[in-house]
């Protein structure tokens, strides 16, 4: 008997079940005969270059496995985690970091050992493309001297229209390696005994802060070799009120807080650093309450040239790295405080984004999250977390020189 006749003679419920099975069979047969589209391979997304002004790089020092550090690129204005995370690149052993928007490149001063964490050491300037975060080149340094200290922004700086990369060395004597990133070549080593770090100075030079309270200014020739060296006489007593080396440079003038709550101006616009005015961050009443700076990266600046300082109450001997509970903002032209921002969580480092709506970025040392505040109102907007961070001590913004 034909199939249609059998179906018509079946009870209503059975007839419906049979029709349903036939329909599923027909669909399955059609799906089996159709070819599945192949998943696309080798799909690469690129980032906008130059990066948006409000993006940040967070340095993960990876304290428990330092040869696997990373720089994580984030958009702190976004609410969703999938929109905050833009990418990352690997770094090794607390690598100093620099960014060139002129060359659209990123530089990590890595060091490697031939057998993981032991064996022969090699120091390398690893070069990444900003758009893809892919490694595009490297410059091997001729000796293993790159400093391996807590992350410092002034441990690697670009000068002379981003042609020369300055790398701070300590082994244990201190020096600076000059690397020509345009020619992809090491140039020279300049000794800076008893001094540390590199603050861009003049047209093609740097200054370095010395342990006796003085400073040395160096200028390079067109090839990147030593042209001149001048010592700036001691201008502070490290045994009485030391300077934090983590200053901030605003339009060529550096602002360096002291342990006891002053700030020292240093003008880096000429061939040789010029010591400027020293003024107080605190009132006499606040000084009596032991308000003072504290933390790792304790200063930042916004596009308007305002100075941000991480402050702690009840400070004392040995608390200079403990972080702080407030950020105080200063008009450097007036040398006066204009804003006071209490933090929701204790902070260890700060940064301020370069966008038209600046955000205050604060590292939380307890759980390694990042708090994002409206820099002008002081309102906590969001907390960045669960983005692959282990030990964050430093945030780089898109300001020139970071």
Task: Give, region by region, the residue ranges found by the protein language model.
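Short glycine/acidic-enriched loop and turn motifs that connect beta-strands
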Residues: 62-65, 112-117, 172-173, 213-215, ...
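Short, conserved, GDST-rich strand-edge loop motifs in beta-rich repeat architectures
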Residues: 50-63, 108-122, 309-324
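Repeated scaffold domains used in trafficking and secretory/extracellular systems
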Residues: 38-46, 90-99, 146-157, 192-203, ...
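Asp-box/WD-like beta-propeller blade repeats and closely related beta-sheet repeat scaffolds
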Residues: 132-175, 183-197
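Short loop/turn segments that connect beta-strands within beta-propeller blades
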Residues: 76-79, 130-132, 180-184, 220-223, ...
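A short beta-strand motif characteristic of beta-propeller blades
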Residues: 36-40, 80-89, 134-147, 183-190, ...
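Short coil/turn segments that connect the beta-strands within blades of beta-propeller domains
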Residues: 52-54, 102-104, 161-163, 203-204, ...
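Loop/turn-rich, solvent-exposed surfaces of beta-rich toroidal or solenoidal domains
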Residues: 291-332, 340-356
